[in-house]
From Swiss-Prot:
GO terms for cellular component: cytoplasm. PANTHER family: PHOSPHO-2-DEHYDRO-3-DEOXYHEPTONATE ALDOLASE DAHP SYNTHETASE, PHOSPHO-2-DEHYDRO-3-DEOXYHEPTONATE ALDOLASE, PHENYLALANINE-INHIBITED. Nonribosomal peptide synthetase; part of the gene clusters that mediate the biosynthesis of AM-toxins, host-selective toxins (HSTs) causing Alternaria blotch on apple, a worldwide distributed disease. AM-toxins are cyclic depsipeptides containing the 3 residues 2-hydroxy-isovaleric acid (2-HIV), dehydroalanine, L-alanine which are common for all 3 AM-toxins I to III. The fourth precursor is L-alpha-amino-methoxyphenyl-valeric acid (L-Amv) for AM-toxin I, L-alpha-amino-phenyl-valeric acid (L-Apv) for AM-toxin II, and L-alpha-amino-hydroxyphenyl-valeric acid (L-Ahv) for AM-toxin III. Pfam families: DAHP_synth_1. Induction: Expression is up-regulated more than 10 fold in toxin producing cultures. Keywords: Amino-acid biosynthesis, Aromatic amino acid biosynthesis, Transferase, Virulence. It comes from Alternaria alternata (Alternaria rot fungus). Belongs to the class-I DAHP synthase family. This is Phospho-2-dehydro-3-deoxyheptonate aldolase AMT16. Its EC number is 2.5.1.54.
């Protein structure tokens, strides 16, 4: 990677700072990119409507008592495949609109345990060229196109700068298991304009996520940038639309009835809204994408039996099943419609699990309506 400003001190430990920094490139200001790729009225309506619907579900005010379903690729590396996936998902979104609020999982940045491809923003050409300005431009155009089609989006929040370029396109945010304990990410969540889910820690415990929700509802101050790109101190008012996502962990899965009951009671004891999502992948699938339908089935059984604590699920899905490594020839050699990060279920399986979830929600609504619970 070439740099606009090369650091002459690189490799010289006698310098007191920056000797491990190779150089610097200017970053496109957020407001410039947003003016080049503006949000249309249709996109804005898509985003705002879904934000309101997600909050209504979280607060148990949704008239249809629907289930929030965040579903889509583990990460997006091919905008064309993402658009095709969206077109297919839109048909199911409309088909199950009375029972499911479908939001497309649209992750552009990937936290890595060690090293690896960090996402479409960081390395859009998947060749270690790290053309981040290009990645931001591609990502914003993709999100503008997806929301213009009427598809609301959910994405993971990894830093305090990229949301300034893209957050106007999001209806749901997620803080991952690795970053839920991070003070900076809790501060970030406190200022986001949409609901945010915090995943339980990688060890499977809930305490860090509960602490995160509690922290995010208060005002904070942290470092970020303004829309013109000037480094600034950001002051927030707090975000009361945060919730827990059960994703399993090193100690095992936590999508079973006992785990959900314990999580609900824990939230109630802390004076919090006892409503949560289930991540059907990651620890709950034991990192095997073929287990996701099993998790969905177990959750669907609880929903149709009347469980109301579960407000949503997260599913990793793509056009084709599995995952692939980037070949020597780079992105040109990739198989279309298949993940290059976590393995996903295929489209046929996606149709099956969404149908099962919609049926479970309908049964729950009938059951609790008869009991006068709703």
């Amino acid at each position: 990677m070439s740099f606009h400003v090369n650091n002459k001190a690189v490799g010289d430990p006698l310098n007191s700072e920056d000797w491990r920094i190779k150089g610097y490139n200017p970053l496109t200001p957020p407001n410039l990119l947003q003016s080049e790729i503006p949000q249309t009225a249709k996109s804005r309506d898509t985003v705002f409507k879904a934000r309101e619907e997600v909050i209504a579900i979280f607060q148990n005010k949704d008239a249809q008592k629907r289930l929030l379903v965040v579903i889509g690729p583990c990460s997006i590396h091919d905008p064309l495949a993402a658009l095709e996936y969206c077109d297919r998902l839109m048909k199911l979104k409309e088909k199950y609109q009375d029972d499911l609020l479908i939001v497309m999982r649209s992750y552009l940045e990937k936290p890595r345990t060690t090293i690896g491809w960090k996402g479409l923003i960081n390395d859009p050409d998947i060749d270690n060229s790290f053309k981040i300005n290009k990645g931001l431009r591609i990502s914003r155009q993709l999100f503008a196109d997806l929301t213009e089609k009427g598809m609301p989006l959910a994405s993971e929040m990894l830093d305090t700068i990229s949301p300034q370029f893209l957050a106007d396109m999001f209806s749901v945010g997620v803080i991952g298991a690795r970053t839920t304990e991070s003070q900076l990410h809790r501060e970030l969540a406190s200022g986001l304009s949409f609901p945010v889910g915090f995943k339980n820690g990688t060890d499977g415990t809930l305490d860090v996520a509960i602490d995160a929700i509690d922290s995010a509802k208060y005002p904070h101050h942290f470092l970020s940038v303004t829309k013109p790109g000037v480094v600034a101190i950001v002051g927030t008012i707090g975000n009361h639309d945060c919730f827990i996502i059960l994703r399993g962990g090193r100690k095992g899965t936590n999508y079973d009835a006992k785990s959900i009951k314990e999580a609900r009671e824990k939230l109630e004891s802390e004076g919090m809204n006892p409503r949560l999502m289930i991540d059907c992948s990651h620890g709950n699938s034991e990192k095997n994408h073929m287990n996701q339908p099993k998790v969905v089935h177990a959750v669907a059984e609880q929903i149709e039996a009347g469980e109301t604590a579960v407000i949503g699920v997260m599913i990793e899905s793509n056009l084709k099943a599995g995952t692939q490594k980037v070949p020597k020839e780079g992105k040109a050699g990739l198989e279309y419609g298949m993940s290059i990060t976590d393995a996903c279920i295929d489209w046929k399986t996606t149709e099956t699990v969404l149908a099962e979830l919609a049926g479970a929600v309908a049964k729950r609504r009938t059951l609790l309506g008869q009991n006068g619970t709703y």
